[in-house]
UniProtKB/Swiss-Prot annotation:
PANTHER family membership: SMR FAMILY PROTON-DEPENDENT DRUG EFFLUX TRANSPORTER SUGE, SPERMIDINE EXPORT PROTEIN MDTI
One GO BP annotation of this record: choline transport
Function: Catalyzes the excretion of spermidine.
A Pfam family recorded for this sequence: Multi_Drug_Res
InterPro entries: Small_drug/metabolite_transptr, Small_multidrug_res, Spermidine_export_MdtI
Topological category with respect to the lipid bilayer: Multi-pass membrane protein
Protein name in UniProt: Spermidine export protein MdtI
Sequence intervals crossing the membrane: 6-26, 36-56, 64-84, 88-108
HAMAP family xrefs: MdtI (MF_01597)
Protein encoded by which gene: mdtI
Subunit details: Forms a complex with MdtJ.
Signal peptide: none
Length: 109
């Protein structure tokens, strides 16, 4: 199993946070009707990919991408629940549990 170092993990955390911000801003932009929020969303995505590019220098691509995507989805679900009153049905919860289980399996492999 690969030993993780601080800086790649920090960049991965930054990438996840920027992805969450991008998703929230995209929702708030109302389909780019609020152009500045849409532009900020795009800049956040660019920042997230840039941070992910730095993270994969010290973390295997498959692990970094799975963690980035998985944590991003899980946190975006939580943000949608808190900020926009969006709720998952039982199929959504099953999917989220499978996603988290898959992330654990990839990390353990």
């Amino acid at each position: 199993m690969q030993q993780l170092e601080f800086y790649p993990i920090a960049f991965l955390i930054l990438a996840v946070m920027l992805e969450i911000v991008a998703n929230i801003l995209l929702k708030m932009s109302d389909g780019f009707r609020r152009k500045w929020l849409g532009i900020l969303s795009l800049l956040s995505v660019l920042g997230a990919f840039s941070a992910l590019a730095q993270a994969v220098k010290g973390i295997e691509l498959s692990v970094a991408y799975a963690l980035w995507g998985g944590f991003g989805i899980a946190a975006t679900v939580a943000a949608g629940w808190i900020l926009f009153n969006q709720r998952l049905n039982y199929k959504g919860w099953i999917g989220l549990i499978l996603l988290l289980a898959g992330m654990v399996m990839i990390k353990l492999s």
